[in-house]
């Protein structure tokens, strides 16, 4: 419980969604009610299922959500349990269930797996990699994501990192993914060191792309020139992938 309190830093204050974005409610397998924002575009578009970082809530990246939607993507951004208007309390197994519930809600609405991109930032990237290991999807895109929580703790706390255990281990899952993956990382990231992003990329065995966000830190990475365009281009390629296997 103490470790969860250190890892998860939720904010319960969520404003009304911006124009063009609607609210959704999603219920998880263990009956937790989650709050989500959804931006839709007409036509058979790729859909990003967005898992955010460990702090704040979905409102913190509203500008990025709108920028991705403006590039022709459907975006479902949900809050983990305990974040924003979502019920419950966050813990590792719980946020994995939350991601699965968000994904499943899109499938029930008729979105095929071949148009779903598991998308995550920081801790949410680990959640997205886990999601892609238990649900079929078209592609995975992660930004500022670490190899494991212990590796992040080792960078900040040295020998004391042993108390973290094996929470949020992306390396354990990424090696087995079979879909294309996009990894972006700021080379001045002061929270999740750049080399962890490089290690995560090296561990991926499938088709992959690495985007080095030059001069970007952890919290300003989406301002890196070309990053949002690169994510959108990578996501739209899922449509071509789906067409090629028909």
Predicted regions, residues:
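Acidic catalytic loop of the alpha/beta-hydrolase fold
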Residues: 187-192, 218-219
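Catalytic active-site module of serine/aspartate enzymes centered on a nucleophile-bearing elbow/loop
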Residues: 224-246
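Catalytic histidine-centered segment of alpha/beta-hydrolase-like enzymes
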Residues: 216-226
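Short beta-strand/loop motif that positions the catalytic acidic residue
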Residues: 177-178, 183-185, 189
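Primarily recognizes the serine-hydrolase "nucleophile elbow" in alpha/beta-hydrolase
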Residues: 105-109, 114-158, 173
């Amino acid at each position: 419980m103490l470790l969860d309190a250190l890892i998860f830093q939720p904010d319960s204050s969520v404003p009304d969604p911006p124009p063009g974005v609607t609210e959704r409610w999603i219920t998880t397998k263990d009956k937790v009610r989650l709050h989500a924002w959804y931006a839709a575009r007409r036509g058979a578009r790729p859909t990003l299922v967005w898992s955010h970082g460990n702090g704040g809530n979905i409102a913190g990246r509203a500008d990025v959500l709108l920028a991705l939607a403006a590039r022709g993507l459907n975006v479902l951004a949900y809050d983990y349990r305990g974040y924003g208007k979502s019920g419950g309390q966050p813990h590792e197994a719980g946020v994995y269930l939350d991601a699965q519930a968000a994904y499943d809600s899109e499938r029930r609405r008729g979105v095929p797996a071949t148009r779903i991109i598991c998308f995550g930032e920081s801790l949410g990237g680990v959640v997205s990699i886990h999601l892609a290991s238990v649900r079929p999807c078209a592609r995975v895109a992660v930004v500022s994501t670490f190899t494991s929580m212990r590796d992040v703790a080792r960078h900040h706390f040295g020998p004391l990192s042993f108390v973290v255990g094996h929470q949020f281990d992306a390396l354990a899952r990424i090696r087995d993914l079979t879909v294309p993956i996009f990894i972006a990382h700021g080379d001045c990231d002061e929270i999740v060191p750049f080399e962890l992003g490089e290690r995560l990329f090296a561990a991926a065995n499938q088709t992959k792309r690495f985007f080095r966000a030059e001069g970007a830190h952890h919290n300003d990475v989406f301002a890196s020139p070309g990053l949002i365009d690169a994510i959108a281009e990578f996501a739209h390629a899922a449509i071509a992938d789906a067409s090629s296997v028909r």
